[in-house]
Swiss-Prot record:
Keywords carried by this UniProt record: Cleavage on pair of basic residues, Disulfide bond, EGF-like domain, Extracellular matrix, Glycoprotein, Growth factor binding, Hydroxylation, Phosphoprotein, Repeat, Secreted, Signal
Gene name as annotated: Ltbp1
Disulfide bonds listed in the record: 185-195, 189-201, 203-212, 395-405, 399-411, 413-422, 551-573, 560-586, 574-589, 622-633, 628-642, 644-657, 671-694, 681-706, 695-709, 696-721, 869-881, 876-890, 892-905, 911-923, 918-932, 934-947, 953-964, 959-973, 976-988, 994-1005, 1000-1014, 1017-1028, 1034-1045, 1040-1054, 1056-1069, 1075-1086, 1081-1095, 1097-1110, 1116-1127, 1122-1136, 1138-1151, 1157-1169, 1164-1178, 1180-1192, 1198-1210, 1204-1219, 1221-1234, 1240-1252, 1246-1261, 1263-1276, 1282-1294, 1289-1303, 1305-1319, 1340-1363, 1350-1375, 1364-1380, 1365-1392, 1419-1432, 1427-1441, 1443-1456, 1462-1473, 1468-1482, 1484-1497, 1517-1541, 1527-1553, 1542-1556, 1543-1568, 1616-1627, 1622-1636, 1638-1651, 1657-1672, 1667-1681, 1683-1696
Chain residue ranges for the region called Disordered: 63-148, 752-803
Stated name of the protein: Latent-transforming growth factor beta-binding protein 1
UniProt source species: Rattus norvegicus
Amino acid sequence: MAGAWLRWGLLLWAGLLAWSAHGRVRRITYVVRPGPGLPAGTLPLAGPPRTFNVALDARYSRSSTATSSRSLAGPPAERTRRTSQPGGAALPGLRSPLPPEPARPGAPSRQLHSKAGAQTAVTRFAKHGRQVVRSKVQQDTQSSGGSRLQVQQKQQLQGINVCGGQCCHGWSKAPGSQRCTKPSCVPPCQNGGMCLRPQFCVCKPGTKGKACEITAAQDTMSPVFGGQNPGSSWVPPEPAAKRTSTKKADTLPRVSPVAQMTLTLKPKPSMGLSQQIHSQVAPLSSQNVMIRHGQTQEYVLKPKYFPAPKVVSGEQSTEGSFSLRYGQEQGTAPFQVSNHTGRIKVVFTPSICKVTCTKGNCHNSCQKGNTTTLISENGHAADTLTATNFRVVICHLPCMNGGQCSSRDKCQCPPNFTGKLCQIPVLGASMPKLYQHAQQPGKALGSHVIHSTHTLPLTMTNQQGVKVKFPPNIVNIHVKHPPEASVQIHQVSRIDGPVGQRVKEVQPGQSQVSYQGLPVQKTQTVHSTYSHQQVIPHVYPVAAKTQLGRCFQETIGSQCGKALPGLSKQEDCCGTVGTSWGFNKCQKCPKKQSYHGYTQMMECLQGYKRVNNTFCQDINECQLQGVCPNGECLNTMGSYRCSCKMGFGPDPTFSSCVPDPPMISEEKGPCYRLVSPGRQCMHPLSVHLTKQICCCSVGKAWGPQCEKCPLPGTAAFKEICPGGMGYTVSGIHRRRPIHQHIGKEAVFVKPKNTQPVAKSTHPPPLPAKEEPVEALTSSREHGPGVAEPEVVTAPPEKEIPSLDQEKTRLEPGQPQLSPGVSTIHLHPQFPVVVEKTSPPVPVEVAPEGSTSSASQVIAPTQVTEINECTVNPDICGAGHCINLPVRYTCICYEGYKFSEQQRKCIDIDECAQAQHLCSQGRCENTEGSFLCICPAGFIASEEGSNCIDVDECLRPDVCRDGRCINTAGAFRCEYCDSGYRMSRRGHCEDIDECLTPSTCPEEQCVNSPGSYQCVPCTEGFRGWNGQCLDVDECLQPKVCTNGSCTNLEGSYMCSCHKGYSPTPDHRHCQDIDECQQGNLCMNGQCKNTDGSFRCTCGQGYQLSAAKDQCEDIDECEHRHLCSHGQCRNTEGSFQCLCNQGYRASVLGDHCEDINECLEDSSVCQGGDCINTAGSYDCTCPDGLQLNDNKGCQDINECAQPGLCAPHGECLNTQGSFHCVCEQGFSISADGRTCEDIDECVNNTVCDSHGFCDNTAGSFRCLCYQGFQAPQDGQGCVDVNECELLSGVCGEAFCENVEGSFLCVCADENQEYSPMTGQCRSRATEDSGVDRQPKEEKKECYYNLNDASLCDNVLAPNVTKQECCCTSGAGWGDNCEIFPCPVQGTAEFSEMCPRGKGFVPAGESSYETGGENYKDADECLLFGEEICKNGYCLNTQPGYECYCKEGTYYDPVKLQCFDMDECQDPNSCIDGQCVNTEGSYNCFCTHPMVLDASEKRCVQPTESNEQIEETDVYQDLCWEHLSEEYVCSRPLVGKQTTYTECCCLYGEAWGMQCALCPMKDSDDYAQLCNIPVTGRRRPYGRDALVDFSEQYGPETDPYFIQDRFLNSFEELQAEECGILNGCENGRCVRVQEGYTCDCFDGYHLDMAKMTCVDVNECSELNNRMSLCKNAKCINTEGSYKCVCLPGYVPSDKPNYCTPLNTALNLDKDSDLE
């Protein structure tokens, strides 16, 4: 069949034959199915397939690979060949053998011919010499020798491929045997190819050529299988397992290659045809299939886009590749995999994800490919899906009209269409032709590859279903893919049964039911969209397996939603669709934990539940209520899918039904290009358009109602413009629902398998007529990123009768249903289904192999009978189920027949029915077909039903230069031509006459086929005995002058000396003009010399060491150049780069200084400029400073803080500053501050009637008695008491005198008595007693030995006797103190005749007589000053001061001071004593406690009371806490506990500044142990004495015992019976009843029995004792101090210091 165009499909399966001493022997059977042969010059069309068989026996060792022939070894085995024509058949991925070349006119025949004929053939090739005829004697001698060898071989060799007692031409003996079973290929097969038969190499995938010497990378323009004619549709090569014999496959429907898993084969076209076929696709530069022997097997997958139905032959872009490898990692697998691992199946789904961003909002979208099943047998590929160039292509765009997806966002359109989706016809274009693809081979999705690993348990697939064995065998699947691609692994399973057993494999997206009614395998996709899914078993609580609860499908945070109706078990819920489960409250389903190795408690995969410790069982999700709302649930292995009702369609995961999208209207209307802000449509187009065309192009609004077009990027826009702005989908390509009703008949649309199955599943033929086919297309919205397929009109083929008029037209294409369903094609020859007169029959998508999971069945609205075909889609097996009113019937596929007993389609055994099949061979029945196994020398006929003899003589050069005689199953060679002799192998071989020396004694002898020729020797040689010997020319004189001679074969060569070059014939040496080269003597002049040259250099250059260049002189090597700078060499010169402040000299050989002071007048403005080497200096006068610009500027001294402050302002001047002081202040000596003016230095400022008191910024005059300061404050003026005190003298006259006044009586004999205020008669002179003037009153002082004696004032207005006769130590005014006389002296007796404690009772202080003296009430006279911090009780004479408990009275300081009990060692024995105000604390070290006396620390006794353990921590104590809660003034010298700090020293404690409780709070009282154990008497000497029986310390601050709180325990306000319940105090139980113990700052009002506020400012602030230099302001329960003007608060509480003193202290502290 010369010029035949072959397309090959390949199916490989293997079986274990036997073990031998040399290793395992596998029998690999190649089922080769070529397409129809065509005459040269025609294109291939669909035709009846023919089946041929080739059996190959191969031996491999454990370390070999199945794809390499280099390891083949072992004993010979019988080899059976099947081809479709002479020349054999090519295997997939290999070039087809060249057909026999037809005889050319005038060429010599290859039959028996004479020697003259041979001479004619030789003459055509002879160039010189004469023709020489061999002698007959030589021929006879060689022939006889060969005959003897042939006889010997005939005695030894027997069997096939034996010709004349020896191996036929192209065959040799196999090692270790005497059988001619080893083919030989010359040249040998390269690149791992295998010699299948003589001169025929079977190449590895990716290589081709006669000897497999050409790789895929070298072949850039490889022709494809075939083309397409108008009115025809290309039929791709289907997998071999789907094909049948001619008898059963004459009418197989044609299918389109869209979205199917195809095998790319590139056989070489026949002669003549290759000139007419345009190459379409560059060869795919994919990786070879890597099959690792044993544990790991790799597959190379490429994502293939889903193109439109009209597809030219060949493959598409190689964009994105998946490298899939499965196997066990070393060290991680719990078992070891040997070479004999059985059939392993991997089910996966490839995906490509991308990120789409619109206006800053990005989202991910993933596009899934078809679910794919790969099978390996014993670690080797076992089906065509594992071959090289197998690709899974996912298309983002619905390319139409035969367009192909060449990249993720581009359609490669045919010549007659254009546009983004190939939807726009090109005017004037011809019919579709073959075209080139612009896509470059090997283009990947990304620049690098990501490696990901998926860990799954190895399941077992057998007749009982799919089970997971426990402990599971863990399989790591390694996937290499681009970043945007991913692979979702669904299942890795081992198919049990004997090796080589043919298992009916399940197709992607389908389910299969075995003949026993049990599920065999379902490969439905698990409902998941994760790009890198790692399936890991769940672990559930055992106790929850039998409990029922509600199943929730959504869990957001702690909220559970989408509850399924009804109750289910936790393992059923969480193992399938649920995320949470529970009855009263939901709990999240446990996560699947990743693991390495295995354990005994591992649970099952998603979709399975555990049966026992060994196996897992599929969960029937359809038993869960509400799984498929608006649809019908179909269970699959490990998952489920939904078959939706009318008006609904499946979502991308087939797990729910969603409403159908609305159809795009074809209504036309006006299209407006502009919409005004007032919603007014403007600028309509001249033609009416549909809304889709308008809004997807230039329109802004559409229709008579001015409907605004949706904005780009919105869902509404994507609905009508799927191709984006500027692209529309024409009406004939729009989607229609697949389940739309069509009249009264049903059209079965059947998805095409993407993988070979063991049984042919094609429907029988039907009649049709030549019209465009109409069918329904899928309108279901696909998953994210999956392209929506379109349906295209094809050339007229055939028609299905009784179709509605409103249908979409299409050619036999494959609209994609979902990522889990393979391609769909229409069978135009399907028989008419039984009509029903009631409701229309539903449209069923019937997949091959009976797919319940990939079909959609829409139940009729009013049909009540049971549809067995819907309930069990696989009920017929290998056939189509037709539902009948009663039961059902089956229309079986070719090769099957309907069995009434089994009610299904069973296989027909053709070998048993037809005995005449496979003559000369053996008939072997197969599922749905049969095979003819032919012996060696025979091949199957074109019909595949018989074995016919192979005429080996038709092959070229079988018997070279001899006669070939064909025999049954072999051939032989006879009768050699003249010049030839019979070889030992039975072939005619040429006689070499040139082996005889005398044949050509003085010429060269050249042997030729069948003859020889004497040719004269060429120049440089001489002839001798048929050979040409070389002549040595170098022996001749004067050869190669100026050089050396080297003899060569037939010539000589001159090697010239330096400066000379050889002539073109290399036989002479000539001078080289080096100056012509142009690269010599640069920067100089070149002069040529004989054999050399000379350079003359210019200034600044010198001759190089090689004397061939003028190189620059580096002047910078001289150190004296460029002082104060850097020397930079230049070409032929140099340059000085001077430092800053220098410049180059006139000669440019050094740097000289720049005098900036002379050249730049702007420098040093306001100062003096001094030039320096390389720079200059500026000297600025005082008050000026140097700025950045080298100028002097004024210093703003006033910017300094504190200058002239606080009693002045700073005034900046040029070069200085000036202080402007406030009134009363003057500038200091240094002029930087304002100091107070001491006005009192001038003694006259307050004259003689007072003294001056200087103040800050001023002064005041303190005037004597009788004088006062005027309003201006200058001096002291007399006070006119007579005007100020009216009636001061009564009836006497008032006379003002300086500093005082006089009362003058009108009668000179009367005198004014100040006691009575009247004038009375003068006493007689003989009264004997001299009247003394009135005693004046001044201040009484105490403790004159104190440094601050001026502050020790007892009372301000007392007489001298009242002071000195009581407790006073001195008397005076304004600190002018007159000490009191010492008791016991005459002065004291004269002043105090009655002694201490008595004062005169009358006016006169000097009257004698006891009756005139009275007891002095010191408590009344001196107030609180006489008994500070105590209670004063007057006695006669004297007084008593009663102090609080824990304090004592100091008679010198007249004050009650705290008693330091810690001075007594008996106060705290074995503990730490801490003195407190009025008491002390005894601290015991843990675990010691106080005893009953509370004065000794002892070990605690065993008791039932549990004493709290408290650790003692010491830290800093802060004495002050600001209003912002900032700690300051830490206690210096010691660290304290929290209790010690808060109760004794500070306000906060620790580095965290822990606050102490408020001192008036109960927490403080409890912390610091301040219980009140008695009451105070209001009167009497025991008023401050508590009624406690003994005086003791306060309670331990860590342990407050209850006995100290008994008096306050549970006393409520109602129990007191006191008004207001002791407000501002607490109720205390006393012997007489109850009383109030007032809080600090309050005292008890006995009349009202309430606690009233103490006005500390009026009662306690005598002589500023509370607020020193401050004003006292009373508050509720306390008081506060506000400093007087000129004073500021000090660090002492309630003490204000003068402002100057505070400033000085601040300055001192700053200095420190």
